[in-house]
Amino acid sequence: MTQTIGIIGSGLVGGALARLAVDAGYNVVLSNSRGPETISGLVQELGPLARAGTVDEAIAAGDIIALPLPLASFEALPADKLAGKVVLDQTNYYPEFWRNAELDNLALTSSELVQRHLKDSIVIKGLHNFDWNHMYSNARPKGDAERMTIPVAGDDDDAKRLVTQFLKSIGYDVVDAGSLAESWRIEPGAPIYFWPYAPVVPDGLTEDEEKRHYLEAPVPPVTTETARKMIDRAVRPSPVGGTLASMPPAHVAIFLALASGNTVQK
């Protein structure tokens, strides 16, 4: 039986994830906080394997529930409806958009924060450490020499296997980064976060040339061995969290131009 991916969030990342899922033959139920009617154009582009639904409908239908959301949105997630579900946590902590004292004090990781709210769900961290464009463009079929390895973290082996199989199906090899408590090793500021999956933009380009290069240039593959080494050598960053200033300027310019005001504010 074909599995269904329920997606809560239909922005840049949610749209890229939905495209990868339908390309791999998964059914997708895409939702957002504004209602199914606001996703009709995207769903039409995605084809017959995708449909729009309410958040509750996406949760009910999904074998995996993906959260391509700002971290600040986690408290609005319906914990009761998500009970028993495997949740793919794609959120990241960026304090300039939303601040949390427990995260700042290293009391827990961002995925532990999500798991605490979704106390009866099984949270797996993954598909969070690159942007929407490269999430889609870096995907490769099994056996391709350019296939990338990405990390996951979580506390439940069965849920990890389910998510790992999904990620392999949509174009990635997977390395286990440990528990949610250890997921700081793959959070913003860690060696495996973002930069290995984005192209290096050369000096001397105009702003438009930088953007085009960033979107179109090939990225060298991250092998499983390289991914493991990056995870193992990670040192917990302090202060914690990502910043736009630490990102490639071309990425920031494209993100701010395309992202919704709701995303930027959070």
Label each residue range with its predicted role:
Residues 52, 122-126, 175-177:
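General beta-strand structural signal in soluble alpha/beta enzymes
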Residues 79-85, 118-119, 142-144:
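Short, conserved loop/helix-junction motifs that constitute active-site signature segments
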Residues 91-141:
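Rossmann-fold NAD(P)-binding glycine/threonine-rich loop
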Residues 2-4, 84, 147:
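Phosphate-coordination loops involved in phosphoryl transfer and adenosine-cofactor binding
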